[in-house]
From Swiss-Prot:
Pfam families noted in UniProt: ATP-synt_B
Protein's UniProt name: ATP synthase subunit b
Function text: F(1)F(0) ATP synthase produces ATP from ADP in the presence of a proton or sodium gradient. F-type ATPases consist of two structural domains, F(1) containing the extramembraneous catalytic core and F(0) containing the membrane proton channel, linked together by a central stalk and a peripheral stalk. During catalysis, ATP synthesis in the catalytic domain of F(1) is coupled via a rotary mechanism of the central stalk subunits to proton translocation. Component of the F(0) channel, it forms part of the peripheral stalk, linking F(1) to F(0).
Source species of the chain: Paramagnetospirillum magneticum (strain ATCC 700264 / AMB-1)
A molecular-function term among this protein's GO annotations: proton-transporting ATP synthase activity, rotational mechanism
Length: 178
């Protein structure tokens, strides 16, 4: 079978002449020349297009990295702000608790002072009431004694003796008042 193919190929070559006289050969040569001549400019254009695409992709990647860094910085800033806010809130709470304790102590102290003052006022009122009661008892005793003395003197002394005693008492009165 191979021998038949060789024989057919040789017969074909003898019938048509040399290979460079065939139009297929020259079409092939022209195609190769066109491809060879167009290769350099086309490869440059393809390389330029690929370089441009690569540069565009690189710029997008750089922008993405920059955006990522900015996002990380913003995240860190917000986390720091959140920590600071939490710390400030804790400080405010601690201050409020301390202030509440201080106010409670102050209120207890003020209540104690007020209670002592009221107790003192009550004691003063009691002392005044006692003094008033003593004065009233003394006045009542004096009135009773005067009444008894008048009764006794009136029964035992005469009118002349009573007048003499009153006159002597009036004379002694300025010396006893000063």
């Amino acid at each position: 079978m191979i021998s038949v193919a060789y024989a057919a190929d040789a017969a074909h070559a003898a019938a048509h002449g040399a290979f460079y006289t065939e139009p297929h050969f020259w079409v092939d040569v022209a195609f190769i020349l066109v491809v060879a001549l167009a290769f350099k400019p086309v490869s440059r254009a393809i390389a330029a297009a690929l370089d441009a695409r690569s540069a565009k992709i690189k710029s997008r990647l750089d922008e993405a990295h920059k955006l990522r860094e900015e996002a990380q910085e913003m995240l860190a800033t917000y986390q720091r702000k959140q920590r600071d806010a939490m710390k400030e809130a804790e400080e405010i709470i601690a201050h409020a608790k301390a202030e509440a304790e201080r106010l409670a102590k102050q209120a207890a102290k003020d209540l104690e002072v007020s209670m002592k003052r009221r107790e003192q006022m009550a004691m003063d009122r009691i002392a005044q009431a006692e003094a008033q009661a003593v004065r009233e008892v003394q006045n009542l005793a004096v009135d009773v004694a005067i009444g008894a003395a008048q009764k006794v003197i009136g029964e035992s002394l005469s009118a002349a003796q009573t007048g003499s005693l009153v006159d002597n008492a009036i004379k002694d009165l300025p010396g006893k008042l000063h």
